[in-house]
């Protein structure tokens, strides 16, 4: 099987809340991996917001965004309807991870994380 690079882009999406101190999410600009391999995308919450819940979304070229999962600081996650088992979430401190295993052509997309104040 020939090595085929797969480019995954994940720009930042931040859902603003009414709190005084707004969380900031940091994501790397892009990642690439080959078909059949795994990739781990990171979304980091700013200081003082490490307990916030985030959501991961996928936007394939020419399509509307798709909700993938809600991810808590404990690492517990709930996936959206029809999201393949190849997609999983995990957490460590302020970092929230989206892992995609056994990469497929259709995984080439933009990946966004967003957060909100779960107390509002």
Swiss-Prot record:
Chain residue ranges for the region called Complementarity-determining-2: 71-77
Cystine connections: 43-113
Domain Ig-like: 23-120
Keyword Membrane: yes
Organism per entry: Homo sapiens
Annotated stretches, region: Framework-3: 78-113
UniProt name for this protein: Immunoglobulin lambda variable 4-60
Role this protein plays: V region of the variable domain of immunoglobulin light chains that participates in the antigen recognition. Immunoglobulins, also known as antibodies, are membrane-bound or secreted glycoproteins produced by B lymphocytes. In the recognition phase of humoral immunity, the membrane-bound immunoglobulins serve as receptors which, upon binding of a specific antigen, trigger the clonal expansion and differentiation of B lymphocytes into immunoglobulins-secreting plasma cells.
Signal peptide start and end residues: 1-21
Top-level taxon: Eukaryota
Framework-2, as annotated region: 54-70
Cell compartments where the protein resides: Secreted; Cell membrane
Region of interest (Complementarity-determining-1), residue spans: 47-53
Keywords: Adaptive immunity, Cell membrane, Disulfide bond, Immunity, Immunoglobulin, Immunoglobulin domain, Membrane, Secreted, Signal
Residues covered by region (Framework-1): 22-46
Coiled-coil residues: none
Ranges where the record places region Complementarity-determining-3: 114-120
One GO term describing the cellular component: extracellular region
